[in-house]
Amino acid sequence: MNNHYHPTGHRDAKTYAGDRPWPQWPGVPSGLSSSSGLLQNRYYAPAGPFPLLPYFGELGAGPDTAMNQAKRQRAEVSYQQPRPYPTGRGTGSMGYQSKVRVTDKYKVVGFISSGTYGRVYKALGRHGQPGEFAIKKFKPDKEGEQASYTGISQSAVREMALCSELHHPNVIRLVEIILEDKCIFMVFEYAEHDLLQIIHHHTQQPRHPIPPNTIKSIMFQLLNGCQYLHTNWVLHRDLKPANIMVTSSGEVKIGDLGLARLSYKPLHSLYGGDKVVVTIWYRAPELLLGSRHYTPAIDMWALGCIFAELLSLRPIFKGEEAKMDSKKTVPFQRNQMQKIVDIMGLPTKERWPLLTSTTEYSQLSTLQPPIHHGGHHGHHYQSQRQAAAANAGVSHLEKWYYNTINQQTGGSGPGSGTSPLASLGAEGYKLLAGLLEYDPQRRLTAAAALQHPFFSTGDPVSANCFEGLKTEYPHRRVSQDDNDIRTSSLPGTKRSGLPDDSLRPGKRVKEG
Protein backbone atom coordinates (compact mmCIF):
# COMPACT_ATOMS: atom_id res chain seq x y z
CA MET A 1 0.00 0.00 0.00
CA ASN A 2 1.46 3.33 -0.96
CA ASN A 3 1.28 6.49 1.07
CA HIS A 4 -0.06 8.99 -1.42
CA TYR A 5 -3.18 11.07 -1.68
CA HIS A 6 -5.55 10.32 -4.50
CA PRO A 7 -6.59 13.23 -6.76
CA THR A 8 -10.00 13.15 -5.04
CA GLY A 9 -8.33 14.25 -1.85
CA HIS A 10 -8.53 11.02 0.13
CA ARG A 11 -5.49 9.23 1.38
CA ASP A 12 -5.36 5.48 0.88
CA ALA A 13 -7.57 3.23 2.95
CA LYS A 14 -4.79 3.09 5.52
CA THR A 15 -5.95 6.50 6.73
CA TYR A 16 -9.43 7.07 5.36
CA ALA A 17 -10.81 3.68 6.32
CA GLY A 18 -14.32 2.61 5.55
CA ASP A 19 -15.20 2.37 9.22
CA ARG A 20 -15.13 6.16 9.45
CA PRO A 21 -18.37 7.65 8.10
CA TRP A 22 -18.20 10.52 5.67
CA PRO A 23 -18.82 13.79 7.47
CA GLN A 24 -22.41 14.93 7.14
CA TRP A 25 -22.81 18.34 5.57
CA PRO A 26 -24.48 20.46 8.25
CA GLY A 27 -26.97 23.24 7.68
CA VAL A 28 -25.51 24.14 11.02
CA PRO A 29 -23.77 21.38 12.98
CA SER A 30 -26.51 19.64 14.93
CA GLY A 31 -24.01 18.95 17.69
CA LEU A 32 -24.17 22.63 18.54
CA SER A 33 -27.57 22.09 20.11
CA SER A 34 -26.21 19.44 22.47
CA SER A 35 -24.44 20.12 25.72
CA SER A 36 -22.18 17.17 24.96
CA GLY A 37 -20.42 18.75 22.02
CA LEU A 38 -19.72 21.78 19.92
CA LEU A 39 -19.29 20.15 16.57
CA GLN A 40 -21.25 17.35 14.98
CA ASN A 41 -18.48 16.18 12.70
CA ARG A 42 -15.34 14.86 14.36
CA TYR A 43 -14.14 12.83 11.44
CA TYR A 44 -11.78 13.41 8.55
CA ALA A 45 -12.82 15.89 5.90
CA PRO A 46 -10.98 15.08 2.67
CA ALA A 47 -12.13 16.74 -0.52
CA GLY A 48 -14.98 14.56 -1.57
CA PRO A 49 -18.72 14.32 -1.40
CA PHE A 50 -19.52 17.69 0.15
CA PRO A 51 -20.70 20.88 -1.49
CA LEU A 52 -18.29 23.76 -1.08
CA LEU A 53 -18.50 25.77 2.09
CA PRO A 54 -20.56 28.83 1.11
CA TYR A 55 -18.70 32.12 1.37
CA PHE A 56 -20.93 34.97 2.45
CA GLY A 57 -20.60 38.55 1.42
CA GLU A 58 -20.79 41.53 3.72
CA LEU A 59 -24.53 40.95 4.17
CA GLY A 60 -24.97 37.48 2.71
CA ALA A 61 -27.64 35.01 3.74
CA GLY A 62 -26.47 31.72 5.13
CA PRO A 63 -27.08 28.73 7.33
CA ASP A 64 -28.36 30.87 10.22
CA THR A 65 -31.82 30.63 8.67
CA ALA A 66 -31.70 26.82 8.89
CA MET A 67 -31.42 26.80 12.64
CA ASN A 68 -34.26 27.82 14.93
CA GLN A 69 -33.86 30.40 17.67
CA ALA A 70 -33.82 27.89 20.53
CA LYS A 71 -31.00 25.92 18.94
CA ARG A 72 -29.01 29.09 18.33
CA GLN A 73 -29.33 30.11 21.96
CA ARG A 74 -28.26 26.68 23.20
CA ALA A 75 -25.34 26.72 20.77
CA GLU A 76 -24.15 30.09 22.00
CA VAL A 77 -24.37 29.01 25.64
CA SER A 78 -22.56 25.76 24.83
CA TYR A 79 -19.77 27.66 23.11
CA GLN A 80 -19.37 30.64 25.40
CA GLN A 81 -19.47 28.97 28.82
CA PRO A 82 -16.50 26.89 29.96
CA ARG A 83 -17.36 23.45 31.27
CA PRO A 84 -15.55 20.26 32.28
CA TYR A 85 -14.75 18.02 29.34
CA PRO A 86 -15.95 14.45 29.78
CA THR A 87 -13.44 11.67 29.27
CA GLY A 88 -13.78 8.84 26.80
CA ARG A 89 -14.97 10.90 23.83
CA GLY A 90 -13.42 11.38 20.44
CA THR A 91 -10.07 9.62 20.47
CA GLY A 92 -10.83 8.18 23.87
CA SER A 93 -7.89 9.81 25.63
CA MET A 94 -8.87 13.46 25.74
CA GLY A 95 -10.44 14.57 28.99
CA TYR A 96 -10.59 17.25 31.66
CA GLN A 97 -8.88 16.45 34.95
CA SER A 98 -8.79 18.63 38.04
CA LYS A 99 -7.41 16.19 40.64
CA VAL A 100 -4.13 15.24 39.02
CA ARG A 101 -0.76 16.98 38.99
CA VAL A 102 0.79 17.50 35.61
CA THR A 103 4.21 16.36 36.83
CA ASP A 104 2.72 13.07 38.05
CA LYS A 105 1.66 12.18 34.50
CA TYR A 106 4.43 13.86 32.50
CA LYS A 107 8.17 14.35 32.83
CA VAL A 108 8.97 17.86 31.59
CA VAL A 109 12.05 17.80 29.36
CA GLY A 110 12.42 21.51 28.67
CA PHE A 111 11.02 24.79 27.43
CA ILE A 112 10.04 25.28 23.76
CA SER A 113 8.52 28.74 23.36
CA SER A 114 6.39 31.42 24.97
CA GLY A 115 3.94 34.09 23.95
CA THR A 116 1.17 36.30 25.25
CA TYR A 117 -0.82 33.18 26.22
CA GLY A 118 1.88 31.54 28.37
CA ARG A 119 4.53 28.88 27.79
CA VAL A 120 4.97 25.61 25.89
CA TYR A 121 7.06 22.73 27.24
CA LYS A 122 8.18 19.42 25.83
CA ALA A 123 7.35 16.43 28.03
CA LEU A 124 7.52 12.64 28.12
CA GLY A 125 4.65 10.47 29.30
CA ARG A 126 4.88 8.55 32.55
CA HIS A 127 3.22 5.39 33.88
CA GLY A 128 2.37 3.49 30.74
CA GLN A 129 1.69 6.56 28.61
CA PRO A 130 4.64 6.50 26.22
CA GLY A 131 5.47 9.21 23.75
CA GLU A 132 6.36 12.87 23.52
CA PHE A 133 3.94 15.70 24.26
CA ALA A 134 3.74 19.48 24.12
CA ILE A 135 2.22 21.02 27.24
CA LYS A 136 0.79 24.50 26.90
CA LYS A 137 0.54 26.33 30.22
CA PHE A 138 -1.67 29.39 30.24
CA LYS A 139 -0.20 32.19 32.28
CA PRO A 140 -2.22 33.68 35.17
CA ASP A 141 -4.09 36.92 34.66
CA LYS A 142 -1.58 38.77 36.84
CA GLU A 143 1.96 37.60 37.25
CA GLY A 144 4.16 37.93 40.29
CA GLU A 145 5.29 35.98 43.27
CA GLN A 146 1.68 35.08 43.95
CA ALA A 147 -0.45 34.50 40.88
CA SER A 148 -3.79 36.26 40.85
CA TYR A 149 -6.65 34.22 39.44
CA THR A 150 -9.72 36.04 38.16
CA GLY A 151 -10.99 33.61 35.56
CA ILE A 152 -10.20 31.88 32.29
CA SER A 153 -9.32 34.03 29.30
CA GLN A 154 -11.58 34.06 26.26
CA SER A 155 -8.72 32.75 24.13
CA ALA A 156 -8.16 29.79 26.46
CA VAL A 157 -11.87 28.93 26.51
CA ARG A 158 -12.03 28.99 22.72
CA GLU A 159 -8.95 26.87 22.28
CA MET A 160 -10.04 24.29 24.85
CA ALA A 161 -13.58 24.08 23.48
CA LEU A 162 -12.56 23.73 19.86
CA CYS A 163 -9.54 21.47 20.32
CA SER A 164 -11.58 19.06 22.42
CA GLU A 165 -13.95 18.52 19.49
CA LEU A 166 -11.64 18.65 16.46
CA HIS A 167 -10.12 15.35 15.32
CA HIS A 168 -8.28 15.30 12.01
CA PRO A 169 -4.79 14.15 10.98
CA ASN A 170 -3.90 17.65 9.78
CA VAL A 171 -5.02 19.44 12.95
CA ILE A 172 -2.90 19.15 16.09
CA ARG A 173 -4.48 16.69 18.54
CA LEU A 174 -5.38 17.64 22.10
CA VAL A 175 -4.68 14.77 24.51
CA GLU A 176 -6.13 16.19 27.71
CA ILE A 177 -6.68 19.28 29.83
CA ILE A 178 -5.38 19.49 33.40
CA LEU A 179 -6.39 22.12 35.95
CA GLU A 180 -3.83 22.36 38.76
CA ASP A 181 -3.52 25.14 41.33
CA LYS A 182 -5.74 27.39 39.20
CA CYS A 183 -3.43 26.92 36.20
CA ILE A 184 -4.62 25.39 32.94
CA PHE A 185 -2.42 22.89 31.12
CA MET A 186 -3.35 21.72 27.62
CA VAL A 187 -1.49 18.57 26.61
CA PHE A 188 -1.01 18.13 22.84
CA GLU A 189 0.67 15.56 20.67
CA TYR A 190 4.26 16.60 19.97
CA ALA A 191 5.60 17.57 16.55
CA GLU A 192 9.35 17.68 16.02
CA HIS A 193 9.32 20.59 13.56
CA ASP A 194 7.38 23.67 12.58
CA LEU A 195 7.09 25.26 9.16
CA LEU A 196 8.96 28.40 10.20
CA GLN A 197 11.94 26.31 11.22
CA ILE A 198 11.88 24.36 7.94
CA ILE A 199 11.79 27.56 5.88
CA HIS A 200 14.62 29.03 7.95
CA HIS A 201 16.73 25.89 7.37
CA HIS A 202 16.54 26.46 3.61
CA THR A 203 17.76 30.05 3.94
CA GLN A 204 21.09 28.90 5.39
CA GLN A 205 24.09 28.98 3.08
CA PRO A 206 24.20 27.54 0.60
CA ARG A 207 20.63 28.78 0.16
CA HIS A 208 18.51 26.08 -1.48
CA PRO A 209 14.82 25.97 -2.39
CA ILE A 210 12.32 23.65 -0.75
CA PRO A 211 11.78 20.74 -3.19
CA PRO A 212 8.58 21.03 -5.26
CA ASN A 213 7.13 17.71 -4.06
CA THR A 214 7.64 18.83 -0.47
CA ILE A 215 5.81 22.09 -1.20
CA LYS A 216 2.96 20.18 -2.83
CA SER A 217 2.59 17.85 0.12
CA ILE A 218 2.71 20.67 2.68
CA MET A 219 0.11 22.73 0.82
CA PHE A 220 -2.20 19.76 0.25
CA GLN A 221 -2.12 18.81 3.92
CA LEU A 222 -2.68 22.42 5.00
CA LEU A 223 -5.66 22.72 2.67
CA ASN A 224 -7.01 19.38 3.88
CA GLY A 225 -6.83 20.54 7.50
CA CYS A 226 -8.35 23.90 6.60
CA GLN A 227 -11.22 22.27 4.75
CA TYR A 228 -11.98 20.22 7.85
CA LEU A 229 -12.03 23.36 10.01
CA HIS A 230 -14.18 25.29 7.55
CA THR A 231 -16.59 22.39 7.06
CA ASN A 232 -17.14 22.56 10.80
CA TRP A 233 -17.61 26.35 10.67
CA VAL A 234 -14.29 27.08 12.36
CA LEU A 235 -12.10 30.00 11.26
CA HIS A 236 -8.49 29.64 12.39
CA ARG A 237 -7.69 33.36 11.97
CA ASP A 238 -3.95 33.09 12.69
CA LEU A 239 -2.42 30.83 10.08
CA LYS A 240 1.33 31.44 9.70
CA PRO A 241 4.43 29.22 9.45
CA ALA A 242 5.11 29.32 13.20
CA ASN A 243 1.65 27.83 13.86
CA ILE A 244 2.07 24.93 11.43
CA MET A 245 3.57 21.82 13.02
CA VAL A 246 5.30 19.00 11.12
CA THR A 247 5.97 15.57 12.60
CA SER A 248 9.08 13.50 11.90
CA SER A 249 6.91 11.31 9.64
CA GLY A 250 6.10 14.33 7.45
CA GLU A 251 2.54 14.89 8.65
CA VAL A 252 1.54 18.56 8.62
CA LYS A 253 -0.71 19.75 11.44
CA ILE A 254 -2.43 23.08 11.97
CA GLY A 255 -1.83 24.28 15.52
CA ASP A 256 -2.56 27.17 17.89
CA LEU A 257 -6.32 27.67 17.75
CA GLY A 258 -6.24 30.43 20.35
CA LEU A 259 -7.78 32.92 17.90
CA ALA A 260 -10.13 30.44 16.22
CA ARG A 261 -13.86 31.12 16.19
CA LEU A 262 -17.07 29.53 15.02
CA SER A 263 -18.58 31.20 11.96
CA TYR A 264 -22.06 29.71 11.68
CA LYS A 265 -23.79 33.13 12.00
CA PRO A 266 -22.83 35.17 8.94
CA LEU A 267 -24.93 38.19 9.96
CA HIS A 268 -23.19 38.39 13.32
CA SER A 269 -20.11 40.59 13.28
CA LEU A 270 -16.97 38.63 14.08
CA TYR A 271 -15.18 41.89 14.79
CA GLY A 272 -16.54 42.57 18.26
CA GLY A 273 -14.06 41.80 21.01
CA ASP A 274 -11.30 41.03 18.52
CA LYS A 275 -9.71 44.29 17.44
CA VAL A 276 -6.96 42.55 15.47
CA VAL A 277 -6.78 39.02 14.08
CA VAL A 278 -4.16 37.33 11.90
CA THR A 279 -0.49 38.29 12.10
CA ILE A 280 0.07 41.36 9.91
CA TRP A 281 2.07 39.69 7.10
CA TYR A 282 -0.68 37.11 6.53
CA ARG A 283 -3.67 39.40 7.03
CA ALA A 284 -6.20 39.44 4.20
CA PRO A 285 -7.00 42.73 2.43
CA GLU A 286 -10.61 42.71 3.64
CA LEU A 287 -9.29 42.78 7.22
CA LEU A 288 -6.85 45.57 6.41
CA LEU A 289 -9.72 47.53 4.89
CA GLY A 290 -11.89 47.14 7.99
CA SER A 291 -14.32 44.36 7.08
CA ARG A 292 -16.29 43.12 10.10
CA HIS A 293 -18.20 40.26 8.48
CA TYR A 294 -15.24 38.29 7.28
CA THR A 295 -15.37 34.66 6.18
CA PRO A 296 -13.18 31.55 5.89
CA ALA A 297 -11.58 33.36 2.95
CA ILE A 298 -9.24 35.11 5.42
CA ASP A 299 -7.63 31.72 6.12
CA MET A 300 -7.27 31.07 2.40
CA TRP A 301 -5.39 34.35 1.90
CA ALA A 302 -3.04 33.33 4.72
CA LEU A 303 -2.46 29.98 3.00
CA GLY A 304 -1.65 31.85 -0.20
CA CYS A 305 0.95 33.87 1.70
CA ILE A 306 2.38 30.66 3.17
CA PHE A 307 2.52 29.08 -0.31
CA ALA A 308 4.45 32.10 -1.59
CA GLU A 309 6.80 31.90 1.40
CA LEU A 310 7.51 28.22 0.70
CA LEU A 311 8.52 29.26 -2.82
CA SER A 312 10.66 32.30 -2.01
CA LEU A 313 11.74 31.51 1.59
CA ARG A 314 10.65 34.98 2.70
CA PRO A 315 7.27 36.58 3.45
CA ILE A 316 5.71 37.88 0.25
CA PHE A 317 4.04 40.88 1.95
CA LYS A 318 6.48 41.92 4.67
CA GLY A 319 5.00 45.14 6.04
CA GLU A 320 5.33 47.05 9.28
CA GLU A 321 2.45 47.17 11.73
CA ALA A 322 1.08 50.53 12.84
CA LYS A 323 0.49 51.03 16.55
CA MET A 324 -2.91 51.64 18.07
CA ASP A 325 -3.49 55.20 19.18
CA SER A 326 -4.27 56.32 22.73
CA LYS A 327 -7.96 55.54 22.19
CA LYS A 328 -7.11 51.91 21.40
CA THR A 329 -8.55 52.20 17.92
CA VAL A 330 -7.03 50.13 15.14
CA PRO A 331 -5.32 52.36 12.56
CA PHE A 332 -5.35 51.71 8.85
CA GLN A 333 -2.37 49.45 8.15
CA ARG A 334 -1.06 51.56 5.28
CA ASN A 335 2.39 50.03 5.10
CA GLN A 336 1.10 46.46 4.95
CA MET A 337 -1.54 47.32 2.35
CA GLN A 338 1.13 49.05 0.27
CA LYS A 339 3.24 45.87 0.29
CA ILE A 340 0.26 43.98 -1.12
CA VAL A 341 -0.44 46.65 -3.74
CA ASP A 342 3.20 46.62 -4.87
CA ILE A 343 2.72 43.06 -6.14
CA MET A 344 -1.03 42.68 -6.61
CA GLY A 345 -1.85 46.15 -7.94
CA LEU A 346 -4.54 48.36 -6.47
CA PRO A 347 -7.88 46.62 -5.89
CA THR A 348 -10.66 47.86 -8.14
CA LYS A 349 -14.45 47.64 -8.13
CA GLU A 350 -14.20 45.44 -11.22
CA ARG A 351 -11.99 42.93 -9.40
CA TRP A 352 -13.84 43.29 -6.08
CA PRO A 353 -17.46 44.52 -6.41
CA LEU A 354 -17.96 45.03 -2.64
CA LEU A 355 -14.73 46.98 -2.27
CA THR A 356 -16.49 50.32 -1.82
CA SER A 357 -18.43 49.00 1.18
CA THR A 358 -15.26 48.49 3.25
CA THR A 359 -14.75 51.08 5.98
CA GLU A 360 -11.22 51.99 4.88
CA TYR A 361 -11.96 52.22 1.15
CA SER A 362 -11.08 55.92 1.04
CA GLN A 363 -7.59 55.11 2.32
CA LEU A 364 -6.72 53.34 -0.93
CA SER A 365 -6.27 56.73 -2.59
CA THR A 366 -3.30 57.37 -0.29
CA LEU A 367 -1.39 54.36 -1.64
CA GLN A 368 1.15 54.48 -4.44
CA PRO A 369 0.43 52.38 -7.54
CA PRO A 370 3.08 49.73 -8.16
CA ILE A 371 6.02 50.61 -10.41
CA HIS A 372 6.87 47.92 -12.91
CA HIS A 373 10.67 47.70 -12.86
CA GLY A 374 11.00 45.60 -15.95
CA GLY A 375 10.79 48.47 -18.45
CA HIS A 376 13.50 49.89 -20.74
CA HIS A 377 16.48 51.57 -19.17
CA GLY A 378 16.61 55.34 -19.27
CA HIS A 379 12.95 55.99 -18.56
CA HIS A 380 12.46 58.98 -16.33
CA TYR A 381 11.03 58.37 -12.85
CA GLN A 382 8.06 60.62 -13.61
CA SER A 383 7.15 58.70 -16.73
CA GLN A 384 7.37 55.50 -14.70
CA ARG A 385 4.93 56.96 -12.20
CA GLN A 386 2.55 58.02 -14.96
CA ALA A 387 2.65 54.55 -16.48
CA ALA A 388 2.10 53.05 -13.04
CA ALA A 389 -0.94 55.23 -12.44
CA ALA A 390 -2.42 54.18 -15.77
CA ASN A 391 -2.00 50.51 -14.84
CA ALA A 392 -2.65 50.81 -11.11
CA GLY A 393 -4.96 47.80 -11.02
CA VAL A 394 -2.64 45.46 -12.93
CA SER A 395 -1.23 42.60 -10.88
CA HIS A 396 2.45 41.72 -11.05
CA LEU A 397 1.96 38.44 -9.19
CA GLU A 398 2.65 36.34 -12.29
CA LYS A 399 5.99 38.08 -12.84
CA TRP A 400 6.82 37.63 -9.14
CA TYR A 401 5.99 33.92 -9.37
CA TYR A 402 8.11 33.13 -12.41
CA ASN A 403 11.01 35.24 -11.16
CA THR A 404 10.85 33.25 -7.93
CA ILE A 405 10.67 29.72 -9.32
CA ASN A 406 13.34 30.49 -11.95
CA GLN A 407 15.61 32.44 -9.63
CA GLN A 408 18.52 30.03 -10.09
CA THR A 409 18.54 30.51 -13.85
CA GLY A 410 17.46 34.11 -14.22
CA GLY A 411 14.41 33.26 -16.31
CA SER A 412 11.30 35.42 -16.05
CA GLY A 413 8.64 33.61 -18.04
CA PRO A 414 6.75 30.33 -18.16
CA GLY A 415 8.94 27.33 -18.90
CA SER A 416 12.28 29.14 -18.76
CA GLY A 417 15.26 27.76 -16.88
CA THR A 418 15.95 24.53 -15.09
CA SER A 419 15.42 25.57 -11.47
CA PRO A 420 14.01 22.72 -9.32
CA LEU A 421 10.90 24.82 -8.71
CA ALA A 422 10.29 25.29 -12.44
CA SER A 423 8.44 21.97 -12.44
CA LEU A 424 5.61 23.64 -10.51
CA GLY A 425 4.79 25.41 -13.77
CA ALA A 426 1.70 27.37 -14.69
CA GLU A 427 -0.58 25.40 -12.37
CA GLY A 428 1.44 26.63 -9.40
CA TYR A 429 0.81 30.21 -10.45
CA LYS A 430 -2.91 29.59 -10.97
CA LEU A 431 -3.24 28.11 -7.48
CA LEU A 432 -1.31 31.01 -5.94
CA ALA A 433 -3.42 33.56 -7.83
CA GLY A 434 -6.61 31.82 -6.72
CA LEU A 435 -5.57 31.96 -3.07
CA LEU A 436 -4.42 35.59 -3.32
CA GLU A 437 -7.58 36.83 -5.02
CA TYR A 438 -8.58 40.28 -3.74
CA ASP A 439 -12.32 39.53 -3.69
CA PRO A 440 -13.00 37.12 -0.80
CA GLN A 441 -16.06 35.78 -2.62
CA ARG A 442 -13.92 34.80 -5.62
CA ARG A 443 -11.00 33.50 -3.59
CA LEU A 444 -10.50 29.74 -3.77
CA THR A 445 -12.13 27.71 -1.03
CA ALA A 446 -10.13 24.95 0.62
CA ALA A 447 -12.30 22.32 -1.08
CA ALA A 448 -11.83 23.89 -4.51
CA ALA A 449 -8.08 24.26 -3.96
CA LEU A 450 -7.77 20.55 -3.11
CA GLN A 451 -9.28 19.75 -6.52
CA HIS A 452 -6.87 22.11 -8.32
CA PRO A 453 -4.84 20.59 -11.19
CA PHE A 454 -1.69 21.67 -9.33
CA PHE A 455 -2.09 18.57 -7.15
CA SER A 456 -3.06 16.11 -9.91
CA THR A 457 -0.25 16.94 -12.35
CA GLY A 458 3.25 15.52 -11.99
CA ASP A 459 4.18 13.15 -9.18
CA PRO A 460 1.41 11.98 -6.82
CA VAL A 461 1.05 14.06 -3.68
CA SER A 462 2.64 12.25 -0.75
CA ALA A 463 1.15 12.05 2.73
CA ASN A 464 4.75 12.42 3.96
CA CYS A 465 6.14 15.83 3.05
CA PHE A 466 9.67 14.53 3.72
CA GLU A 467 9.37 11.57 1.33
CA GLY A 468 12.44 11.21 -0.87
CA LEU A 469 14.38 13.98 0.89
CA LYS A 470 18.01 13.58 1.85
CA THR A 471 17.79 16.70 4.01
CA GLU A 472 17.53 16.12 7.74
CA TYR A 473 15.82 19.04 9.42
CA PRO A 474 16.92 19.95 12.94
CA HIS A 475 14.37 19.31 15.65
CA ARG A 476 12.70 22.15 17.51
CA ARG A 477 15.03 23.76 20.00
CA VAL A 478 14.27 22.70 23.57
CA SER A 479 15.93 24.49 26.49
CA GLN A 480 16.66 21.83 29.10
CA ASP A 481 17.90 24.48 31.52
CA ASP A 482 14.32 25.70 31.86
CA ASN A 483 12.07 22.77 32.68
CA ASP A 484 10.24 24.07 35.76
CA ILE A 485 6.66 24.05 34.54
CA ARG A 486 5.47 25.52 37.85
CA THR A 487 7.33 28.83 37.48
CA SER A 488 5.10 31.87 36.99
CA SER A 489 7.62 34.21 35.37
CA LEU A 490 7.56 34.36 31.60
CA PRO A 491 10.33 35.35 29.20
CA GLY A 492 9.78 37.29 25.99
CA THR A 493 8.12 35.76 22.97
CA LYS A 494 11.34 35.32 20.98
CA ARG A 495 12.54 31.80 20.31
CA SER A 496 16.30 31.37 20.23
CA GLY A 497 17.97 30.03 17.13
CA LEU A 498 15.78 31.77 14.55
CA PRO A 499 16.04 35.28 13.13
CA ASP A 500 13.74 37.82 14.75
CA ASP A 501 12.32 39.10 11.48
CA SER A 502 11.11 35.64 10.54
CA LEU A 503 9.19 35.24 13.78
CA ARG A 504 7.07 38.33 13.79
CA PRO A 505 6.33 41.49 11.81
CA GLY A 506 8.97 44.17 11.70
CA LYS A 507 9.18 47.17 13.96
CA ARG A 508 5.86 48.90 14.38
CA VAL A 509 5.54 52.38 13.02
CA LYS A 510 3.22 55.14 14.18
CA GLU A 511 0.80 56.11 11.44
CA GLY A 512 -0.10 59.72 11.16
Curated annotation (Swiss-Prot):
Its cofactor is Mg(2+). ATP binds at residues 112-120, 136. It comes from the Eukaryota. Its EC number is 2.7.11.22, 2.7.11.23. CDD domains: STKc_CDK8_like (cd07842). SUPFAM superfamilies: Protein kinase-like (PK-like) (SSF56112). It holds the Pfam family Pkinase. One of its GO terms (molecular function) is ATP binding. Residues 476-485, 497-512 have a biased composition (Basic and acidic residues). GO terms for biological process: negative regulation of filamentous growth; negative regulation of transcription by RNA polymerase II; nuclear-transcribed mRNA catabolic process, non-stop decay; positive regulation of transcription by RNA polymerase II; protein destabilization. The keyword Transcription applies. InterPro entries: CDK, Kinase-like_dom_sf, Prot_kinase_dom, Ser/Thr_kinase_AS. It is found in: Nucleus. Residues 106-455 form the Protein kinase domain. Belongs to the protein kinase superfamily. CMGC Ser/Thr protein kinase family. CDC2/CDKX subfamily. This is Serine/threonine-protein kinase SSN3. It comes from Chaetomium globosum (strain ATCC 6205 / CBS 148.51 / DSM 1962 / NBRC 6347 / NRRL 1970) (Soil fungus). The gene is SSN3.
